[in-house]
Each structure stands twice: as C-alpha cells, then as structure tokens.
C-alpha cells in the first residue's frame, strides 16, 4: 500500500517538471515580464489543459518561427498572476493554492475564460462568491458581465440589492452608473420592488412602515 509521501511525490511530478524546467520547449511571459522573469513550460502540458493554447502553438506564426524556443506573451496578466496560473495548470489533482486563489481570483477568472479552462473558472467563481460583501459586490457584478456568468451575476446582484442603501451612497456606485447605465437601472428597479414588497401597513394609522 502506497504511503502518503509516495502519493505526494506522484502528484507532484508535473510540478517538479515545471520547477526543474526539464525539456521545457516554450517560454511564457506576462505583460509586465522581461526576459529574466519568463516562465519555461512544456507545450504538451499547455495543450492538454487548454484548446486555446493548442491553437496558439499550432498557428502559422509559431510553425514558421526559426527560434529554438518560442515565446507566448499573456499580456493581460502580471507575472505573479501568471505564476499562479501556470502552477494550477501543472497540478494533476485540479487544485490551486488557496492563498493564490484569494489573491488572484479575478485575474484568474478572466484567464480561465480566455484560455478555456472551465474548472479554474469554477474555482475562481466559488472564491468570488464566498468573498462577496457590500464593498466588492459592484466590481464582482461587473466582472460577471463579459462574458455573462449567471452563476456569479445573481449572487452579486442580490448582495447589491440587499445593501443598496450603503452601496448607493458611495462614489463607486456613481462611477458604476456612468459605466453601466442599464445595469444600474436594473438594480434600482429591483431595489424599489424589494422595498415595496417588504413594507407593511400599520393597522392603526394605515401608513406604511
């Protein structure tokens, strides 16, 4: 019977491959990276995880390249975010470091969509939902729009409606209204509906309270 340490060694094989850069054949760069902060990776691993990476690496641009090692630049990501992204790709158990997930949930959510890695998107969505509060609900609702993600949109929308008196008085809401007027109208309509259905009539004076 295999011991836990043997299992850990087995599961960590791909991570070791990444760390030791053994037979690495592609260089990954973030938008803020230079040549000294590139991440050396393996095409087969990237292709196995993402159809988008497969299309990139099979494109005419890369096939025609005379370079010994091609570079893929993920310009939308910072180097630290790219490190977390690549580390996830190399994990065979489908998990991600909780600290990395908490810190980079939004950027990884975008990356998961762009590079078509649904499981990572699910993990990021769950983290974002668990962290929802009145101070971040607007930005998370905004994040859920492109592409539209109902599973993230709905709890963010509900959080906003529940805390509308606090949220609507802040400067962030004014900016949100300017950038997303249609969404703002939906929020106000839902808030009015919620308010009207929650009000009761006093039996003595026939006034709402």
From Swiss-Prot:
Coiled coil: none annotated. Keywords: Ubl conjugation pathway. May act as a substrate-specific adapter of an E3 ubiquitin-protein ligase complex (CUL3-RBX1-BTB) which mediates the ubiquitination and subsequent proteasomal degradation of target proteins. The BTB/POZ domain mediates the interaction with some component of ubiquitin ligase complexes. This is Putative BTB/POZ domain-containing protein At2g40450. Pathway: Protein modification; protein ubiquitination. The keyword Flavoprotein does not apply. It comes from the Eukaryota. SUPFAM superfamilies: POZ domain. It holds the Pfam family BTB. GO terms for biological process: protein ubiquitination.
């Amino acid at each position: 019977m295999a011991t836990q340490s043997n299992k850990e060694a087995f599961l960590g094989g791909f991570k070791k491959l990444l760390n030791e850069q053994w037979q690495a054949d592609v260089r990954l760069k973030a938008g803020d990276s230079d040549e000294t902060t590139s991440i050396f990776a393996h095409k087969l691993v990237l292709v196995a995880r993402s159809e988008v990476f497969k299309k990139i690496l099979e494109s005419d641009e890369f096939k025609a390249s005379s370079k010994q090692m091609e570079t893929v630049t993920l310009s939308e990501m910072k180097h630290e975010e790219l490190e977390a992204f690549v580390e996830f790709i190399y994990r065979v158990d489908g998990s991600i470091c909780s600290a990395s997930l908490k810190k980079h949930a939004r950027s990884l959510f975008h990356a998961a969509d762009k590079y078509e890695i649904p499981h990572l998107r699910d993990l990021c969505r769950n983290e974002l939902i668990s962290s929802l509060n009145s101070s971040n609900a607007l930005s998370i609702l905004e994040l859920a729009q492109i592409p539209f993600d109902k599973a993230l949109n709905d709890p963010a929308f509900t959080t906003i409606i529940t805390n509308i008196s606090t949220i609507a008085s802040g400067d962030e809401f004014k900016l949100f209204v300017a950038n997303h007027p249609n969404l703002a109208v939906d929020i106000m309509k839902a808030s009015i509906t919620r308010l009207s259905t929650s009000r009761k009539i006093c039996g003595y004076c026939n006034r709402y309270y």
